[in-house]
């Protein structure tokens, strides 16, 4: 049925000096399909933008194999993968760019009032921490909605502790744009709950940049343990209004005298000057409950006997700018022999832990370190047999974790199962000297200028310095989007860097094995003497590493030396060969790679003597990028349409699956792999079993970047009641005022077309159905108002396949419209009628 409504003005309405003899028509159009016909899909309503599938470099630091990285008590949600009405920024690797410092190199900006990011919980949560950025100098609130209801509490945000300028960096020297703010809901929300961060009219710190939100299910506050002395019993103020420094000192002294521990109840405590603690066990109610406001909690300026054990509280600082000339670090100095730190939260201090003067047989675990101005944790000499494990470290202004053998050696240090993301300067993990240290099963993501994922280095900074010696074990680490341009060198640093900066690797064996290097913007492994003195890098063994998606080469050697390499498999390598050019000797091939078995997907030839431009390997491409099958009758099958899948990369892409969803089927020629520079075809057909708009997805899963490659599929299943004319183009011989031809096909019976007053007959209205279709009947509608009295109209119906030559389908006849039956008339068309253009 092609539904067209013949309309006239209601009786009694006659414009002055005008005849009322106008042909009014076609408020809505419906075509009943007979046989195989095409139909019109109903337009979907406007909704908030949902982020599309992220680019290949958006691999999450949390989607890694079990046993790798920290086991963390939160679920992280990327803003770009949530629903949002703001602006997506990134991806980017440009120094000094907001997107570059974001997790996954993407974030969402709220640039106007009313814009939001909305997260849907996949597990229960009662608290969250949002990683955000504001313009420099800005502070303000951000509204929080749960299931559409605004909370009375707002997030209080500031840029005061962000934006560090490091003048020693060439180019853009400002970094650390982001900070963190956390909130407890006061109740637990279950999976499926929506949490929206929205810039309301009272939230004036625009633009808000939202990177990620970490949702926690925080356990209840702990109660005071036996044999402990509470700081409040010594006069500490849990409201944070009064200074509690003296009360803490007195509690520590009293606890030591009694052989008991120190208890910090829930509350906020102001500490105005650092504590000196020889030995103590200090316990809080939990890092979301016991909060200490200070930039420096403990400062032991010489070795202590220890142990100084710390657990279950937060140190929340307010450090503005980096302070290398002071000891303003959350935990500074010595904590002694055998100490344990467990379950702290440290934020907005200069450094999290700066451990020096003497620390041994110690453990730092289950701790969050965020938004420090310099290192997260640094063993600054005199540390032995200490383990740092299962910690989450984000947004440091320098190395995430570091071993620095100044003024004496660090030895037997283990960094294991930590997750380190977004160090905004320097490395995720660095071992500067020392002996027999281990770096295992960590995750490092998104390093910035001067930063590798992992650096094994003889850079001394100061003397006396103890170079690397013994065996340095680096195993099972996952490095994601690590390595960066070094603006001071003018060339990139690798995801992994072996750096004979101030002395050669001569008395050390470095075993690098297992794990993966994923999505590095530049090279995977770098061998360099960063001072430019050409010291050799020897004793390096690399084995069984998975490398995927590099901007340049697997190996970049800038000095002399020897490395043994086996079992390194690579795909998506941006540039063929290896950079191998010794400096300052300017000798091609100065570095020797002894290649064992199991290497694939890369080569040490050709030898490159100029730093290659990154050719970030492209994802597979699909042409066309979407398929539209139009209208297909329910129970029928469309003709096949073809998608060409091309591989622009430098290596073959293995194909794990080709699939379609919805009422679609496919056949393909892709086989088990697509050769470098090659292509395959996928033929798709549409076979609806019901009416309406029916979508699907063609998905090609491969080893290439951005897998799976997806192609959107759309079509409409047509049944006998399908409205073919809805939304289609309508034209008329004339129109009066706002009563235009498009009113015929808008689906609204209260709007209509009316011809120009006094225009001669015949007046026509024509609908273009988009293609030749089989049509069974035509329905005409007047507005249903009873003001439109019963009347009979005389009409004829014509059809055309080309819009030029029309033939009569139904001769002139009278059709009665009665308000009591909906003011509708139906015209049956001859069996077998086909037309693209239908004219009344």
Tell where the protein language model's regions lie, with residue ranges.
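Extracellular beta-strand-rich solenoid/capping regions of secreted or surface-exposed proteins
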Residues: 249, 253-254, 269-283, 291-339, ...
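Disordered, acidic Ser/Thr/Pro-rich linker "stalks" and the adjacent N-terminal cap
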Residues: 36, 96-102, 617, 718-772, ...
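Short glycine/acidic-rich loop motifs that flank beta-strands on beta-rich extracellular proteins
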Residues: 36-37, 260, 271-274, 286-287, ...
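Acidic Gly/Asp/Thr-rich repetitive segments characteristic of extracellular carbohydrate-active
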Residues: 231-265
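Juxtadomain low-complexity/linker regions and immediately adjacent membrane-anchoring helices
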Residues: 52-81, 219-230, 712, 716-746, ...
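Feature for long, exposed domains in two main contexts
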Residues: 615-720
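Right-handed parallel beta-helix
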Residues: 285-288, 306-317, 337-348, 359-375, ...
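Extracytoplasmic
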Residues: 52-224
């Amino acid at each position: 049925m092609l539904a067209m409504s013949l309309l006239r003005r209601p009786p009694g309405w006659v414009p002055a000096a005008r005849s009322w003899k106008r042909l009014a028509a076609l408020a809505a159009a419906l075509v009943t399909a007979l046989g195989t016909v095409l139909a019109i899909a109903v337009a979907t309503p406007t909704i908030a933008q949902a982020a599309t599938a992220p680019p290949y470099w958006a691999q999450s630091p949390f989607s890694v194999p079990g046993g790798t990285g920290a086991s963390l008590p939160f679920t992280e949600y990327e803003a770009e993968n949530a629903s949002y009405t703001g602006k997506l920024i990134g991806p980017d690797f440009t120094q000094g760019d907001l997107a570059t410092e974001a997790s996954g190199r993407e974030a969402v900006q709220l640039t106007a009032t009313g814009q939001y990011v909305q997260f849907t919980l996949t597990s229960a949560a009662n608290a969250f921490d949002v990683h955000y950025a504001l313009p420099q100098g800005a502070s303000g609130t951000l509204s929080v909605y749960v299931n559409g209801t605004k909370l009375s509490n707002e997030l209080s945000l500031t840029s005061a502790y962000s934006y560090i300028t490091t003048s020693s960096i060439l180019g853009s020297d400002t970094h650390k744009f982001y900070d963190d703010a956390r909130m407890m809901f006061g109740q637990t929300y279950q999976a499926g709950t929506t949490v929206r961060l929205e810039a309301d009219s009272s939230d004036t710190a625009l633009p808000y940049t939202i990177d990620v939100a970490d949702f926690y299910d925080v356990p209840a506050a702990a109660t005071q343990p036996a044999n402990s002395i509470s700081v409040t019993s010594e006069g500490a103020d849990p409201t944070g209004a009064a200074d509690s420094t003296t009360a803490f000192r007195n509690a520590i002294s009293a606890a030591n005298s009694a052989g008991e521990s120190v208890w910090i109840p829930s509350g906020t405590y102001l500490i105005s000057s650092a504590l000196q603690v020889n030995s103590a066990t200090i316990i809080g109610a939990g890092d979301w409950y016991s909060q200490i406001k200070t930039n420096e909690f403990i400062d032991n300026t010489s070795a202590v006997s220890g142990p100084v054990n710390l657990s279950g509280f937060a140190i929340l600082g307010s450090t503005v700018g980096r302070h290398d000339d002071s000891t303003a670090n959350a935990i500074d100095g010595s904590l002694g022999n055998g100490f344990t730190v467990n379950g702290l939260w440290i934020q907005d201090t200069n450094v999290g832990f700066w451990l020096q003067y003497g620390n041994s047989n110690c453990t730092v675990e289950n701790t969050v370190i965020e938004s420090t101005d310099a290192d997260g944790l640094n063993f600054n000499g005199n540390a032995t047999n200490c383990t740092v494990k299962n910690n989450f470290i984000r947004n440091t202004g320098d190395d995430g974790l570091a071993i620095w053998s100044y003024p004496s050696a660090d030895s037997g240090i283990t960094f294991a199962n930590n997750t380190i993301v977004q160090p905004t300067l320097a490395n995720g993990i660095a071992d500067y000297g020392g002996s027999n240290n281990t770096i295992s099963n960590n995750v490092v993501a998104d390093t910035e200028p001067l930063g590798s994922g992992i650096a094994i280095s003889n850079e001394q900074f100061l003397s006396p310095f103890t170079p690397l010696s013994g065996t340095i074990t680096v195993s099972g680490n996952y490095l994601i989007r690590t390595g960066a341009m070094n603006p001071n060198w003018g060339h990139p640093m690798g995801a992994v860097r072996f750096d004979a900066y101030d002395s050669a690797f001569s008395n050390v064996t470095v075993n690098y094995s297992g794990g993966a290097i994923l999505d590095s913007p530049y090279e995977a492994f770098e061998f360099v003497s960063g001072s430019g003195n050409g010291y050799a890098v020897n004793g390096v063994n690399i084995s069984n590493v998975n490398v995927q998606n590099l901007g340049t080469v697997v190996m970049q050697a800038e000095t002399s030396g020897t490395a043994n390499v086996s079992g390194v498999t690579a795909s998506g390598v941006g540039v063929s060969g290896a950079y191998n050019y010794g400096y300052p000797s300017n000798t091609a091939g100065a570095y020797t790679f002894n290649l064992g078995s199991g290497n694939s997907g890369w080569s040490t030839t050709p030898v490159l003597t100029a730093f290659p431009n990154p050719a970030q390997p492209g994802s597979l491409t699909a042409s066309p990028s979407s398929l539209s099958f139009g209208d297909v009758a329910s129970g029928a099958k469309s003709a096949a349409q073809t998608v060409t899948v091309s591989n622009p990369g430098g290596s073959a892409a293995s194909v794990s699956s080709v699939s379609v969803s919805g009422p679609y089927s496919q056949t393909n020629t892709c086989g088990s792999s697509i050769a470098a520079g090659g292509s395959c075809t996928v033929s798709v057909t549409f076979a609806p079993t019901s009416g309406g708009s029916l979508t699907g997805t063609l998905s090609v899963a491969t080893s290439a970047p951005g897998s799976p490659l997806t192609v959107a599929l759309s079509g409409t299943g047509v049944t006998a009641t399908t409205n073919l004319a809805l939304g289609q183009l309508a034209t008329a011989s004339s129109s009066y005022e706002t009563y235009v031809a498009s009113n015929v096909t808008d689906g609204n019976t209260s709007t209509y077309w009316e011809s120009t007053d006094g225009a001669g007959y015949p007046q026509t209205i024509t609908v273009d159905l988009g293609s030749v279709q089989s049509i069974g009947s035509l329905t005409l509608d007047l507005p249903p108002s009873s003001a439109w009295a019963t009347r009979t109209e005389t009409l004829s119906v014509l059809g055309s396949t080309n819009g030029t030559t029309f033939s009569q389908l139904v001769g002139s006849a009278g059709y009665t419209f009665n308000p009591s039956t909906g003011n509708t008339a139906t015209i049956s068309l001859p069996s077998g009628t086909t037309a693209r253009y239908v004219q009344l």
